[in-house]
From Swiss-Prot:
This is Ribosomal RNA small subunit methyltransferase J. It catalyses: guanosine(1516) in 16S rRNA + S-adenosyl-L-methionine = N(2)-methylguanosine(1516) in 16S rRNA + S-adenosyl-L-homocysteine + H(+). Its EC number is 2.1.1.242. Signal peptide: none annotated. It is found in: Cytoplasm. S-adenosyl-L-methionine binds at R96, D97, D168. Specifically methylates the guanosine in position 1516 of 16S rRNA. Belongs to the methyltransferase superfamily. RsmJ family. The gene is rsmJ. Keywords: Cytoplasm, Methyltransferase, rRNA processing, S-adenosyl-L-methionine, Transferase. HAMAP family: 16SrRNA_methyltr_J. The keyword Methyltransferase applies. GO terms for molecular function: rRNA (guanine-N2-)-methyltransferase activity.
Length: 250
């Protein structure tokens, strides 16, 4: 479990959000490793000995640029966004792709199993809902805390199958900026091992009605060693598309 240091300046909204996740309140930072810090109106991830931090902010920086200037063209094609599909993001992480998909007008159900990451993402969505420029997009994201491979079958029984299941398993960010590399290093250290790829892909193909879209590095290996039906390839990233079991590629 992850420690969280709650500063006296933390708002009641932040304190309420924190209680939704199994975190360990502490009175001072740990001697080593990572921890969450709740202060003012934000929850951030800190690494002992480092000045920088990680927060989920959909209202500025890279998220704002992608929202106002584009940048989601390839993922839009991969999910066939013009058909207005419902999307379940089974590996939400810090929510960047969920937000891009929601900014395309799609309804996104996001799953995140790590309590600290889910807390960071939930906080980012909460603040985005308060911003007039992002509130409509944020309102289209429904976050579920838990293991997607375990939760999706149960959710299908109550909501039916989604059109798309989206997967973005963790992989090294070799060509990203130094700031992004440091952020991902924090993230990987916090999360540790990723979900079982075989089980995740299998469950996704059982769940989706139309397709499973997997984000990979352009030259990366196929997820779980399984070749996709087809691909959308960009300069540094590609999207592998798998069909649901029993579906006809044609």
């Amino acid at each position: 479990m992850t420690d969280i240091l709650i500063d006296d300046t933390a708002t009641e909204a932040v304190r309420t959000l924190i209680r939704a996740f199994p975190l360990v309140p502490v009175s001072q930072p740990p001697e080593q490793g990572s921890y969450l810090l709740a202060e003012h109106d934000t929850v951030s991830l800190r690494l002992v000995g480092e000045k920088s931090n990680v927060i989920v902010d959909f209202t500025s920086g890279a998220a704002q640029y992608r929202r106002t200037k584009g940048g989601g063209e390839l993922i839009a094609k991969a999910v066939n966004h013009t058909a207005h599909p419902t999307v379940w993001d089974a590996t939400a992480g810090l929510g960047r792709d969920s937000f891009v998909l929601a900014s395309l007008g799609l309804t996104v159900t996001a799953f995140e199993q790590h309590p600290a990451v889910a807390c960071l993402l939930s906080d980012g969505i909460r603040r985005a809902l308060l911003n007039p420029e992002t509130q409509d997009t944020a309102a289209r994201i429904n976050l579920h805390f838990g293991n997607a491979a375990e939760q999706m079958p149960a959710l299908v029984k109550t909501q039916g199958k989604p059109d798309i299941v989206y997967l973005d398993p963790m992989y090294p960010e070799r060509r990203k900026s130094a700031a992004v590399k440091k952020e991902m290093a924090y993230f990987h250290r916090l999360v540790g091992e990723a979900q079982d790829e075989v089980i995740l892909l299998h469950t996704a193909r059982q769940t989706a009605k139309k397709r499973v879209v997997v984000k990979r590095p352009r030259l990366g290996e196929h997820l779980a060693g399984q070749a996709p039906a087809y691909q959308y390839t960009g300069k540094s990233t590609r999207f592998d598309v798998y069909l649901p079991y029993g579906a006809d590629k044609g």
